């Protein structure tokens, strides 16, 4: 079992707060370069190469936010949604063994949240990343991923996958949750997050 500081290089994380995953005073390309070098040996070679800039430009296109043309912009000038999308890209850049998404769209407006979820889906599928997405949005939980686990009082209450998950509706999910827990908490609070 590895200590936490050694395990960290195998895990990519995106938190709920868009401000926590990036360095605001650095440029987009500098943030990406830091993410690219995560877990690698440090060298004295100069900053960002032309090839890296080209790679970053291509990677940013998947986000569909126009950031590929703003590589030298300070991250602090980006919107919360743009920063969160950049954080997602940074967290998945070195293809972690586990990508942990902790309510990564909760602080975003619906349109930007949809773009970030779309980018998430593309990145996860393209790179075949094992991903744990924590969300209180039942629609998102049903629509994304191949397995849905619901917790109640610190324990797994539901574990749904395969064809059963594909056919699931929000109403079905809430009913199953209520049956599994004996709780009447399966209401709008769960549905809306």
Walk through the language-model features, giving the residues of each.
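ABC ATPase NBD coupling module
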Residues: 1-12, 20, 24, 42-49, ...
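Q-loop/switch helix immediately C-terminal to the Walker
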Residues: 26-38
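Helical segment within the ABC ATPase nucleotide-binding domain
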Residues: 114-127
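H-loop/switch region of ABC-family ATPase nucleotide-binding domains
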Residues: 135-136
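Catalytic Walker B motif of ABC-type/P-loop ATPase nucleotide-binding domains
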Residues: 99-102
């Amino acid at each position: 079992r590895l200590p936490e500081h050694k395990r960290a290089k195998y895990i990519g994380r995106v938190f709920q707060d868009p401000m926590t995953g990036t360095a605001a005073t650095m440029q987009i390309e500098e943030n990406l370069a830091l993410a690219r070098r995560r877990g690698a040996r440090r060298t004295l070679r100069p900053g960002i190469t032309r090839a890296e800039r080209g790679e970053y430009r291509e990677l940013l296109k998947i986000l569909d936010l126009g950031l590929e043309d703003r590589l030298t912009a300070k991250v602090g000038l980006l919107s919360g949604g743009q920063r969160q999308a950049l954080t997602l890209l940074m967290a998945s850049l070195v293809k972690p063994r586990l990508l942990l998404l902790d309510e990564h769209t909760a602080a975003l407006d619906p349109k930007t949240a949809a773009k970030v979820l779309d980018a998430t889906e593309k990145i996860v599928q393209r790179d075949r990343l094992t991903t744990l997405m924590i969300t209180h949005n039942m629609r998102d939980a049903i629509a994304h991923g191949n397995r849905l686990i619901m917790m109640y009082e610190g324990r797994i209450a539901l574990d749904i996958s395969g064809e059963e998950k594909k056919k699931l509706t929000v109403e079905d999910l809430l009913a199953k949750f209520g049956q599994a827990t004996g709780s009447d908490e399966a209401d709008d609070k769960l549905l809306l997050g």
